[in-house]
């Protein structure tokens, strides 16, 4: 091989190696740039405190644990059928509505549900089960998740694998029959930095929990092609994926779940 050809070949190889190094190590650079929310204890991740009206009416705020409920129901049951908004404290939940069988009262009505006796909204001795203002309420039940597939982040559970392996079988409806969303399309979303590998979005693992309407058109407007504005800073501000992946679904410090080619 001529000398100039060898030199050119070596330069091409070196350049490719440098580009690849930047590409796979980009996660470290990104982690340093973005202010990822501080991790909560596993037993608190996914727990929220609802206080739209409670304090105003002399009651303690309501604590709600997503991980306690998602073992039994998929997200669409509450966020489609029961009409809970995705954003905390924006749903007009009232005690009167609960007693009429709406919102929490759809299940918590003092009757048996899936073989379990549910507490209702007329027994005043039960109020503190929800109205306790304590984000860590119910943590004594966290040990019930011990046998589920592990994940390093969030509450330490890989919920998608738990469903795939049949370890949990959450109900996908309360009374309505959901439309079957047999969508197995995986999207490849280019990152805003050259050094960050693309994000991979699998529809199938999301439709196992959600309806299409949970994301479209409010969170992701397909017609407006909002993924063009799909940058990490907006996700961390609670937009797009950040609606769920900041407080309930696996958190954003789990870089490899979305950017599988990254090395963190």
For the regions a language model picked out, list residue spans one by one.
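N-terminal export/targeting leaders of redox proteins
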Residues: 1-60, 71, 120-197, 208, ...
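Inter-heme linker and motif-flanking segments adjacent to c-type heme-binding CXXCH motifs
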Residues: 56-67, 73-148, 180-184, 188-264
